[in-house]
Curated annotation (Swiss-Prot):
Record key words, sorted: Endoplasmic reticulum, Fatty acid biosynthesis, Fatty acid metabolism, Lipid biosynthesis, Lipid metabolism, Membrane, NADP, Oxidoreductase, Transmembrane, Transmembrane helix
Transmembrane portions of the chain: 26-46
Disulfide bond entries: none
Taxonomy, superkingdom: Eukaryota
Protein name: Very-long-chain 3-oxoacyl-CoA reductase
Organism: Aspergillus clavatus (strain ATCC 1007 / CBS 513.65 / DSM 816 / NCTC 3887 / NRRL 1 / QM 1276 / 107)
Amino acid sequence: MDFVSKYMSCLSSWGLDLQPGLQSVGAAVLLATGGLFLASRVLTFVRVLLSLFVLPGKPLRSFGPKGSWAVVTGASDGLGKEFALQLARAGFNIVLVSRTASKLATLAEEITAKHSVQTRTLAMDFAANDDTDYEDLKTLVDGLDVSILINNVGKSHDIPVPFALTPEDEMTDIVTINCLGTLRATQLVIPGMMQRRRGLVLTMGSFGGLLPTPLLATYSGSKAFLQQWSTSLGSELEPYGITVELVQAYLITSAMSKVRRTSALIPSPRAFVSSVLSKIGRNGGSPTYSYSSSPYWSHGLMAYFLTCVLQPMGKLVVGQNRTMHEAIRKRALRKAEREKGKKST
């Protein structure tokens, strides 16, 4: 009752002297509101834990039968390569799309040697935005039972850089590859899925799309675009039985991240892709984002804390993000100077 006494004193100090009965009702309303708010937070966190650690995702076979096809963009390295390998292990034929023909050929040979599936390859540079390339992709997938599309192709900045200093070609490539490339590839593949009334469209997002990221402004903006686009697309395609999911990811060991050593927060491509494919349809650490997921356990806990506890758009969070990337930029520039000095000697 100490709370009620303090509540009544507070009302009196504001000149709001209510009748005792009304004071009790007001106190009860405040207690109930606070209790409901706390209970909702607890239930949300329990949902996150169940999604990350207990509940399974949709089985891959629900998207298409054995022998159907999965299209993987950005397939020659890192996450794209791992998606292709694990989907082939699950019995899907694989269409590999990436820039370097020799890498695609090597991966196709590896897949067919390990698994009894078919592969097809298309070497195309998404940065070129060449209509002929997309016509070739359409020709390649037309007539195939494409059950899964993995939109993995992407590009970031070489190092953190202020927007005013961002090279124009780098800025253009990021937007063209991350946004336009993903949209055009998806628009080619989904008509068949809509006709068959099943399928999975999985797009690689980033924490950069959740949190404004100074010194990676163009990349962050491109991933925020994909977040909104994918969520909208998910609602459009749900009546057709198609699952659309954007995967929100922190760092993963890859050429793009320039991180080589794994840790609790930074998984290998194999571990990350395994978590993604086993949790399709589960939000993981992103309970407030429909048609989205943070399935890897540490990324999910981070996403929950950042989006449900903190204010991701607030000055404090954005400022800390800027400070971190300013430090990364300084280290990268010092490293470049050292390497330049070694070459000159």
